[in-house]
């Protein structure tokens, strides 16, 4: 039984990375690329889009809404 080798591109540099135990930083090719990506998120160069912004007047809760 042959195991299919899955290859992905490093999101930072584009280098091909084998998706497996031999690639501990997957999907990144190395620790450096992983840290570059983390820095971009920390500097808010990357963000997850939303429908709108929460303001201080918006009501929200960290509680599970199903428990009310």
Curated annotation (Swiss-Prot):
Cofactor note: Binds 1 zinc ion.
Cofactor entry: Zn(2+)
Keywords: Metal-binding, Zinc
UniProt GO MF annotations: DNA topoisomerase type II (double strand cut, ATP-hydrolyzing) inhibitor activity; zinc ion binding
Gene Ontology BP term (one): regulation of DNA-templated transcription
Residue ranges, compositional bias (Acidic residues): 55-68
Matching Pfam families: YacG
Disordered as annotated region, ranges: 47-68
Gene3D superfamilies in the record: Erythroid Transcription Factor GATA-1, subunit A
PANTHER family linked: DNA GYRASE INHIBITOR YACG (PTHR36150:SF1)
Protein name (record): DNA gyrase inhibitor YacG
Source species of the chain: Yersinia enterocolitica serotype O:8 / biotype 1B (strain NCTC 13174 / 8081)
């Amino acid at each position: 039984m042959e195991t299919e080798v899955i290859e992905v591109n490093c999101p930072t540099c584009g280098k091909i990375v084998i998706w497996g135990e031999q690639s501990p930083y997957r999907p990144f090719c190395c620790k450096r690329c992983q840290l570059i990506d983390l820095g971009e998120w920390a500097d808010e160069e990357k963000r997850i889009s939303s429908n709108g912004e929460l303001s201080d007047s918006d009501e929200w809760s960290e509680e599970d809404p199903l428990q009310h």
